[in-house]
Swiss-Prot record:
It catalyses: L-glutamate 5-semialdehyde + phosphate + NADP(+) = L-glutamyl 5-phosphate + NADPH + H(+). The gene is proA. It is found in: Cytoplasm. This is Gamma-glutamyl phosphate reductase. Catalyzes the NADPH-dependent reduction of L-glutamate 5-phosphate into L-glutamate 5-semialdehyde and phosphate. The product spontaneously undergoes cyclization to form 1-pyrroline-5-carboxylate. Pathway: Amino-acid biosynthesis; L-proline biosynthesis; L-glutamate 5-semialdehyde from L-glutamate: step 2/2.
Amino acid sequence: MDIDQYMTDLGRRARHASRAMARASTAAKNAALDAVARAIERDASALKEANARDVARARDKGLDAAFIDRLTLSDKALKTMVEGLRQVASLADPIGEISNLKYRPSGIQVGQMRVPLGVIGIIYESRPNVTIDAAALCLKSGNATILRGGSEALESNAALAKLIGEGLEAAGLPQDAVQVVATADRAAVGKLITMTEYVDVIVPRGGKSLIERLINEARVPMIKHLDGICHVYVDDRADLAKALTVCDNAKTHRYGTCNTMETLLVSSGIAAALLPPLGKLYRDKQVELRVDAAARAVLADAGVGPLVDATDADWHTEYLAPVLAIKVVDGLDAAIEHINHYGSHHTDAIVTEDHDRAMRFLREVDSASVMVNASTRFADGFEFGLGAEIGISNDKLHARGPVGLEGLTSLKYVVLGHGEGRQ
């Protein structure tokens, strides 16, 4: 296969399809989503057979249980796909909305209209559910998309792509609006991220090594996040019960997600009251604690152990594991300084009953999501009321935080006049 020619052809077809998608009606887009949902229900057995072949090859390669779990299309996973498609269909269509329409002294009206981005390239690991999630969001937001999933899910993605194409055709929309890259060759990624003529934005959903590669090689703009080094700062004016709940959930609800707390900052004024019960809670849940000298002193006195001395590298680390770094700080200023220096601009939270301190934290912490008295685990498109998300961005342009339908659109200015000329 000539990868360069193959990817160029995908791009050309996607660009052509994007024009039809931009003018597609809400009814047609919803009909396509419903048709795909019904096709998945109808062909569940065939999908599972294709997926079983992918899973068998992954097992033969010795891939770990967590990887196999993400790859597997169980009955529950298929049901979740179907529910997700219907949920996206139920969301309000942002395309064509006009906002901020105002009369100007000249007599013209000026506003902004929400429009699709165009062609979105999505690069992700071997998770077949992302094929459906991404296709649904791109379709509803009026975009065409080129999907490049992990090589271990080739057969699963091909089977899903066939059903997506059928759904688009049934709704009178171009099948090229959703195309799945049908090769495991890594050169396909290299070509996709440089096709500025055909691709408007890349959304990578993968590990740190993938994101780092794309940062170095991509010519197409990206919506991305590299790390999720999330913090909770417990202020000395915090409610202790709230602090225990937030700190427990932020770390132990799920270890392997990008919105899990990786560093706990504790004000020196509340450390003696908070750390002993919290340390015992983490110990009982087998969370390894990497602590600074001040935290060690308090925890050791309370009989909490074992403890590992934290190094500077710990403040920079996204563990994605039952490991937590703990540091005692002098107060709010020190906490904000630490977060802005070591954090990844993803999600950070403060626990406090002091309104002024809470507002300072919200203003001064330079992250995509900033929270007061709530777990960092809430940084999620569904929890934020977006309905669904394509990913989370800790960049400042174009979208920031969980990226839902609106994040896959942009605004253009529209002017309504009555024959006016500029004086």
